[in-house]
Amino acid sequence: MAKRSKAYEAAAAKIDAEKFYAPFEAVTLAKDTNPSKFDATVEVAFRLGVDPRKADQMVRGTVNLPHGTGKVARVLVFATGDKAEAAIAAGADFVGSDDLIEKIAAGWTDFDAAVATPDLMGKVGRLGKVLGPRNLMPNPKTGTVTPDVTKAVNDIKGGKIDFRVDKHSNLHFIIGKVSFDAIKLAENYAAALEEVLRLKPSASKGRYIQKATVATTFGPGISVDPNVTKVLTEV
């Protein structure tokens, strides 16, 4: 195991490893224990009581964080004609069709989200081996296969994020930056948790959210009480 820095060890010493913190308390502590000098990302990880190998236990969806993530997403749109012009006007970073498909097929994935008009999905679908593992494949269930490219781009730029449980039954979310007020981080956390709870598969038995952890990019993990769904501001 790699040796932890003195800053990390000092930060970890402020956390009670046996305690489950309320969301507001957890994000406040994450801000206070950030060992980095830069404006680090604040993330949350949920361990779910599902078996992602089974189709009826897959958890996938989107959530609009009320305060965004602090990161402006680079959005790619597969579109032509008027739809391409609309995507450009909405602020998409990359817009095209065959040219982008060829570039991605060669291994380029320097973007954070992809949107496609329905008529191009026959071609875009061939990129599954490249985009699928990176959770970048446009999907009608997440609103990224749509004729309304303007709304899709605006939603993503405004803080909408896609999520999908990984093979280890974990979900990961960026909920903001250390520079965010704690209340905004807590409200983003609550929005993510609410959507995860809403999407609980009926086939999932037993405890659904088994663990919730908040941490900054290089900071120690802070256990959050998954039973607390409201934003409580007392610490």
UniProtKB/Swiss-Prot annotation:
<dbReference type="InterPro" id="IPR028364">
    <property type="entry name" value="Ribosomal_uL1/biogenesis"/>
</dbReference>
<dbReference type="InterPro" id="IPR023673">
    <property type="entry name" value="Ribosomal_uL1_CS"/>
</dbReference>
<dbReference type="GO" id="GO:0000049">
    <property type="term" value="F:tRNA binding"/>
</dbReference>
<dbReference type="InterPro" id="IPR016095">
    <property type="entry name" value="Ribosomal_uL1_3-a/b-sand"/>
</dbReference>
<comment type="function">
    <text>Binds directly to 23S rRNA. The L1 stalk is quite mobile in the ribosome, and is involved in E site tRNA release.</text>
</comment>
<comment type="function">
    <text>Protein L1 is also a translational repressor protein, it controls the translation of the L11 operon by binding to its mRNA.</text>
</comment>
<keyword id="KW-0810">Translation regulation</keyword>
<dbReference type="InterPro" id="IPR005878">
    <property type="entry name" value="Ribosom_uL1_bac-type"/>
</dbReference>
<dbReference type="Pfam" id="PF00687">
    <property type="entry name" value="Ribosomal_L1"/>
</dbReference>
<comment type="subunit">
    <text>Part of the 50S ribosomal subunit.</text>
</comment>
<keyword id="KW-0699">rRNA-binding</keyword>
<protein>
    <recommendedName>
        <fullName>Large ribosomal subunit protein uL1</fullName>
    </recommendedName>
</protein>
<keyword id="KW-0689">Ribosomal protein</keyword>
<dbReference type="GO" id="GO:0006417">
    <property type="term" value="P:regulation of translation"/>
</dbReference>
<dbReference type="GO" id="GO:0015934">
    <property type="term" value="C:large ribosomal subunit"/>
</dbReference>
<dbReference type="InterPro" id="IPR002143">
    <property type="entry name" value="Ribosomal_uL1"/>
</dbReference>
<dbReference type="InterPro" id="IPR023674">
    <property type="entry name" value="Ribosomal_uL1-like"/>
</dbReference>
<keyword id="KW-0694">RNA-binding</keyword>
<dbReference type="GO" id="GO:0006412">
    <property type="term" value="P:translation"/>
</dbReference>
<keyword id="KW-0678">Repressor</keyword>
<keyword id="KW-0687">Ribonucleoprotein</keyword>
<dbReference type="GO" id="GO:0003735">
    <property type="term" value="F:structural constituent of ribosome"/>
</dbReference>
<comment type="similarity">
    <text>Belongs to the universal ribosomal protein uL1 family.</text>
</comment>
<keyword id="KW-0820">tRNA-binding</keyword>
<dbReference type="GO" id="GO:0019843">
    <property type="term" value="F:rRNA binding"/>
</dbReference>
